[in-house]
From Swiss-Prot:
One of its GO terms (biological process) is galactose metabolic process. Belongs to the galactose-1-phosphate uridylyltransferase type 2 family. NCBIfam families: galT_2, PRK05270.1-2, PRK05270.1-3, PRK05270.2-2. The gene is galT. This is Galactose-1-phosphate uridylyltransferase. It comes from Pediococcus pentosaceus (strain ATCC 25745 / CCUG 21536 / LMG 10740 / 183-1w).
Length: 486
């Protein structure tokens, strides 16, 4: 059986709308996309391998250019054939939800992997390892999954007319969008509709997941990120609807926020992050009945709220957030405003712990200064050889997303430490010399030494981003802020 015939069978056997009666129609649809000549056969019977073969057939038949953008657009068009229509998918999701929330997300997650919306082959390239630090075990990842941008595609995209559709990559307008030069294909993309605060929101998976079942919850309306009472209410409502998931929001300011501030959205999934395991350093009283509160033993300044009453938890979170928005303490460089510009916000995270809800509220400050032009509470210059990008939600919780360059750069650091010929980047020199001076390095332990050191740098990165440091001055300043809340 040819790759084309095998894929036709996959389409008919899939949860798509097609049945055996549609076989000839589906066959001809695919022929129209890939061409009738020069068939390429798949290396195995995996759906992704069949699609790869069909895309190669299309290239050989001149149906598409042999360019990353064209190949991706066609692959997703083919995968769309094995994907239910949005209306059918939503109905099936909520039918399965009646069995259990987990049954519903399992169905949607597995479908999103099968139709290659979640790029499992690319994600498998990522490097990850644990690292023991003073704040417990952190999670280190080197992100290799996102495709490098093709210089030709970038140049061609510059000459494409910008029609502003879709408005951004998070908009619901992306569902089923064909894609174009410089804009990702989304033919096989599906969004579950859900209600939050009386409004329609979307739930989808992230194509290049950073952790298990990495999800995005997005506002139906294209409007900027904001942290307010409704944010806390929405996060707790999502956890109520999907109790096996955590969910959090990036901060709504540059430097301390994520990379997408233009569209209101949250991120969640099925993963227990290091911060969620971190203990309470000391309990505090916020004067909200039914809410236990405490300062978390964590490098970033975090207040944990625990309780079964979501309204009381929301009240407590708003109390913290509103106090922080206007709080300054010159003794520790904390300033809510400079020249009328706001600097304060929070990064909130919600999850279940048994019957209780937990809301972790992380204090953020995005000031810059002459000494720290990238941010006073941002990775400082001496750790930027490992991480210089913004510290967003996922990293706040203890999972490092480090740049792809480190995969090769750290190999060169290891060679340097072993006295071998190397091409180590100059920016790693001081760090590598310090490792050399403080460790007895052998061929057997060099990788473990470097990995542990990367973990300690990431702990320092988080400490740099923390507004109240774990020293006498910082702890006293944190105590003053707690008093100010009340």
């Amino acid at each position: 059986m040819s790759s084309l015939e095998q894929f036709v069978q996959v389409v008919i056997d899939s949860p798509s709308p097609y049945t055996n009666l549609d076989r000839i129609y589906v066959h001809n649809r695919i022929l129209g996309l890939v061409g009738e000549d020069q068939p390429v056969e798949a290396t195995d019977e995996q759906v992704t391998s069949l699609v790869d073969a069909l895309v190669k057939t299309a290239v050989q038949n001149g149906k598409i250019e042999d360019a990353q953008s064209d190949r991706s657009i066609l692959a997703d068009q083919l995968m769309d054939l094995v994907t239910p229509l949005p209306s059918i998918l939503n109905q099936r999701f909520w039918d399965k939800y009646q069995v259990s929330p987990k049954a519903a997300t399992d169905y949607f997650f597995n479908l999103s992997k099968t139709n290659d919306y979640i790029k499992t082959r690319a994600i498998a390239k990522n490097v990850s390892f644990p690292a023991e630090t003073d704040f417990g075990e952190l999670e280190i990842t080197i992100n290799l999954s996102k495709p490098e941008k093709d210089p030709k595609a970038i140049a061609a995209a510059r000459n494409q007319p910008q029609d502003g559709y879709p408005l951004c990559q998070l908009c619901m307008q992306n569902e089923g969008y064909l894609g174009r030069l410089g804009y990702p294909s989304r033919s096989n993309h599906r969004i579950i509709r859900m209600t939050l605060g009386g409004e329609t929101w979307g739930f989808q998976y992230s194509p290049y997941a950073y952790f298990n079942e990495h999800s995005i919850f997005l506002d139906q309306i294209h409007r900027p990120m904001v942290i307010n009472r409704q944010t806390f209410t929405n996060l707790l409502e999502i956890v109520k609807q999907l109790p096996h998931y955590f969910v959090g929001s990036n901060a709504d300011l540059p430097i301390v926020g994520g990379s997408m501030l233009s569209h209101e959205h949250y991120q969640g999934g099925r993963h227990v992050f290091p911060m969620m395991k971190a203990p309470i350093a000391r309990t505090i009283d916020l004067g909200v009945a039914g809410v236990e509160a405490g300062i978390v033993k964590w490098p970033m300044s975090t207040i944990r709220l625990v309780g079964s009453d979501v309204v009381a938890l929301t009240d407590a979170a708003v109390k913290i957030h509103d106090a922080w928005m206007n709080y300054s303490d010159e003794s520790v460089d904390v300033r809510a405003f400079t020249d009328g510009t706001r600097h304060h916000t929070t990064t909130p995270i919600a999850y279940k712990d048994g019957e209780n809800y937990v809301l972790d509220v992380v204090l953020r400050d995005n000031q810059t200064s002459a000494e720290f032009p990238d941010g006073i509470f941002h990775p400082h210059q001496d750790v930027q050889h490992i991480k210089k990008e913004n510290i967003g939600l996922i990293e706040v919780m203890g999972r490092a997303i480090l740049p792809a360059r480190l995969k090769t750069e750290l190999v060169e650091v290891e060679k340097y430490l072993l006295g071998q010929t190397n091409q180590m980047a100059e920016m790693h020199q001081a760090w590598a010399d310090q490792l050399k001076a403080t460790n007895s390095i052998t061929a057997e332990n060099v990788t473990a030494v470097v990995n542990a050191a990367v973990g300690n740098v990431f702990a320092r990165v988080l400490a740099d981003a923390g507004v109240f440091k774990w020293d006498d001055a910082g702890e006293a300043a944190f105590a003053r802020f707690i008093s100010a809340i009340n």
